[in-house]
Amino acid sequence: MVLIKVLANLLVLQLSYAQKSSELVVGGDECNINEHPFLVALYTSASSTIHCAGALINREWVLTAAHCDRRNIRIKLGMHSKNIRNEDEQIRVPRGKYFCLNTKFPNGLDKDIMLIRLRRPVTYSTHIAPVSLPSRSRGVGSRCRIMGWGKISTTEDTYPDVPHCTNIFIVKHKWCEPLYPWVPADSRTLCAGILKGGRDTCHGDSGGPLICNGEMHGIVAGGSEPCGQHLKPAVYTKVFDYNNWIQSIIAGNRTVTCPP
């Protein structure tokens, strides 16, 4: 694979995400204000609307989905309520963006990962702290947590003032393969959700973290429409498979290749 630093937005990639262009947590409740210091909100200078989420992994780097890229993107850290500001909230802009170019599957949707270097490092505080990258892969049955400011209703365009959280489980990949043609069996993705339905990421949650045992194991990539349907779990980029790529980019190695 070839590593490229993309300065233009990924228009084709974005248009391909009809299922969950940006997602929110359906079937969840308001997150505890202190449980998501790593959660960031992505928006643009032209709009205050949150179109995606992401996660802070150190003072200078944020991990999110490639299809969340926009021109003039802004990253807000330390936020809980959209309307009541935390004293330690900070806003940053990108210094650089890094992607994996997918040559095996032209639409690139099975490598939905973007690493953003911030123009200025953040200051850690009560509501701003990094999440750990995965130390090992998590298997089927692992309980994980999803969170975001995304849509909370499957029938109405209802978006919360505060992030919502809920627990889901990693399920067998076979549940996702027939639902999403861009998720082949050998893709580096996780399939996760509640098979009976009712709990899911949704529009506005894309790019946000899948947290398992305190580590970021997934990035919200895509799913069904409407969200939270019976036997229709969602797809998450498998962060563990990109650990070496992420650490190499952070260390300054711009020639590192993405996992095949």
From Swiss-Prot:
It holds the Pfam family Trypsin. Residues 25-251 form the Peptidase S1 domain. Gene3D superfamilies: Trypsin-like serine proteases. Expressed by the venom gland. One of its GO terms (molecular function) is serine-type endopeptidase activity. One of its GO terms (cellular component) is extracellular region. It comes from the Eukaryota. Glycans are attached at residue 253. Venom serine protease that selectively activates factor V (F5) in a calcium-independent manner. It cleaves the Arg(1545)-Ser(1546) linkage in the human factor V molecule. Induces the coagulation of mammalian plasma. This is Factor V activator RVV-V gamma. It comes from Daboia siamensis (Eastern Russel's viper).
